């Protein structure tokens, strides 16, 4: 009965062009990768120009980080061996947390930091630990799935507001009667690339005695002076801020952290099940992240951010011209100044066909469909990396232009 039930649902997904399939990267994360399909051998792989990773600064295959990771393994071995609260919390983890609190969260007075294996786990831990029965969570409807799941698992009341509609949020806050209020938002929205107006949200938090929980997965390392992230980008400073950042995107490695008032961090240690009941990340990764943060903050990091900004501007300019020349296609480039550049095409079939046409021309750009994005807004999620070149961007737009002419 179970298998029949699952197969029926799989067929339904297939009919709606919603079935997901994995590819196998045969080479390290980089703009040019050899890629095979699930079921193929490595010898059948093709080289593709990829616009799909979140390696925004191009650090995932950086020699300095490879060396730091190898050094960390020599110093600390292959794994942590236990959870943080048993025997898995090493000096490497502690040093990373101290650095993150000081470097990534100077906007939060007296902040402490707590490291996690993934951003998903960090958000689940955060919202389930803070969102008890005395709390209300106010969440943007386009928040990342991990924030959605954390809010649903929490015992708190949940109120969602339309994307960046702060007049709605203001009315919800004004009507709230619970003693604890948490406004929860992405800083950079992962499927649209736009920024939440964090300054306005903090103003509402201060006005209504609420706390602002920020998922800076796609801003950390990229935005703000020295890549310190979205808090620095907006120049915010308040003890009402609770920051989650990931370390597997711009930082090039893996893991995540929460930075907040010391009492918030202590409460997570005491009660966050997604922190307590899982093995700590390998300490070698924590060791290597120190090298990553130094790169991000230094001259090389700034040069990479500047190059990334130039790539974003070039892509937007070229795509705008292409869309203007082919209005009958109905393509729309989302309003985004970040490395996430969504090309919205509408139907699931259209997005899949466009991705397949690019694949045939040697480009890897993923089609994103519901439920990840709203129905009718299927898209290509183009992501740029500082490891890309201007020639890579030109090649992508040329391939899209070729496909546009064929569709016309």
From Swiss-Prot:
Q: Which family does it belong to?
A: Belongs to the class-II pyridoxal-phosphate-dependent aminotransferase family. BioF subfamily.
Cofactor(s) the protein needs? pyridoxal 5'-phosphate
Identify the pathway: Cofactor biosynthesis; biotin biosynthesis
Disulfide bond entries: none
Query: Partners and quaternary state?
Result: Homodimer.
GO BP annotations listed: biotin biosynthetic process
Instruction: Enumerate the residues binding pyridoxal 5'-phosphate.
Output: 119-120, 190, 218, 246
Q: Give UniProt keywords alphabetically.
A: Biotin biosynthesis, Pyridoxal phosphate, Transferase
Q: Where are the transmembrane segments?
A: none
Could you tell me the EC number(s) of this protein?
Answer: 2.3.1.47
Q: What GO MF annotations does this protein's record show?
A: 8-amino-7-oxononanoate synthase activity; pyridoxal phosphate binding
Superkingdom: Bacteria
Under the heading InterPro entries, the entry gives: Aminotransferase_I/II_large, AON_synthase_class-II, AONS_Archaea/Proteobacteria, AONS_Proteobacteria, PyrdxlP-dep_Trfase, PyrdxlP-dep_Trfase_major, PyrdxlP-dep_Trfase_small
Task: Identify the SUPFAM superfamilies for this entry.
Answer: PLP-dependent transferases
Sum up the protein's function in the record's words: Catalyzes the decarboxylative condensation of pimeloyl-[acyl-carrier protein] and L-alanine to produce 8-amino-7-oxononanoate (AON), [acyl-carrier protein], and carbon dioxide.
Q: Which reaction does it catalyse?
A: 6-carboxyhexanoyl-[ACP] + L-alanine + H(+) = (8S)-8-amino-7-oxononanoate + holo-[ACP] + CO2
Put simply, this protein is called 8-amino-7-oxononanoate synthase
Q: Which residues carry this modification: N6-(pyridoxal phosphate)lysine?
A: 249
Q: Which Gene3D superfamilies match?
A: Aspartate Aminotransferase, domain 1, Type I PLP-dependent aspartate aminotransferase-like (Major domain)
Where does this protein hold substrate? 20, 144, 372
